[in-house]
Amino acid sequence: MNGMCWIASYPKAGGHWLRCMLTSYVTGEPVETWPGIQAGVPHLEGLLRDGEAPSADPDEQVLLATHFTADRPVLRFYRESTAKVVCLIRNPRDAMLSLMRMKGIPPEDVEACRKIAETFIADEGFSSVRIWAGEGSWPENIRSWTDSVHESFPNAAVLAVRYEDLRKDPEGELWKVVDFLELGGRDGVADAVANCTLERMREMEERSKLLGLETTGLMTRGGKQLPFVGKGGQRKSLKFMGDDIEKAYADLLHGETDFAHYARLYGYAE
């Protein structure tokens, strides 16, 4: 199968993990360094930053990841050549908490945590974070790659994958992705999962730092690079920031907004 195959996800949804497993599956080898993930399943934003971009009409299958919403102008070049989309979706509650950890903000710094939570709830996503660009709000991103995807990519087939299901049954869910993308048979799926556990990815991240290779962790003002790979926490309470934060988030989940709609649709309206 020729054409563009997108691994689309909102930031902090587990995209690096899925890309690592796909890279290991395709190559049949462990991913030894952080740049190996980018080499295996490139992130479009990283390519654009380096002045590169895939062909708009590839004569082979191309796996490409992005946090962009599907309707971003830069993606119009791939309108006709996009064949498949894997949309990776994570509980927005946990994505928000993952951002706090990524920024090196401990739960004890309640004021800083509250600021991120209040902004996330108000924006329904990360638009004010200024780490990424073009990702839109959480519901905008999901809608663009699922319900509205054919407005941007009329020929695309779509597979939605929940991060939580990938954590619960990584072999089963990775096989669904591999089969959907027509990458090959089931042989190699178990090895790809074993090669990309969170522990292995932490080791890979640290090894890459020691080798002076680029990783994704943010830099502190003191020049220390924070770890990118966390523990993949799920369904954590927001009450450590105050009952008002938990209530504000609950109100967002149970409103009549697109955020509430997609939270209900994917099982996050707890």
Swiss-Prot record:
Pathway assignment: Antibiotic biosynthesis
Phenotype when changing R202A: 15% decrease in activity
Effect of F77E: 90% decrease in activity
Leader peptide range in chain numbering: none
Catalysis: reaction(s): desulfo-A47934 + 3'-phosphoadenylyl sulfate = A47934 + adenosine 3',5'-bisphosphate + H(+)
EC number: 2.8.2.36
Effect on the protein of changing R101A: Almost no change in activity
Enzyme active site: H67 (proton acceptor)
Disruption phenotype: Deletion mutant produces desulfo-A47934 but not A47934.
Ligand binding (substrate): H43, L44, E45, G46, W132
Molecular function terms, GO-annotated: sulfotransferase activity
GO BP annotation list: antibiotic biosynthetic process
Family of this protein: Belongs to the sulfotransferase 1 family.
Function (record text): Catalyzes the sulfonation of desulfo-A47934, the final step of A47934 biosynthesis. Also has weak activity in vitro with teicoplanin aglycone and teicoplanin.
Subunit annotation: Homodimer.
Protein name: Desulfo-A47934 sulfotransferase
Source organism: Streptomyces toyocaensis
Organism phylogeny: Bacteria, Bacillati, Actinomycetota, Actinomycetes, Kitasatosporales
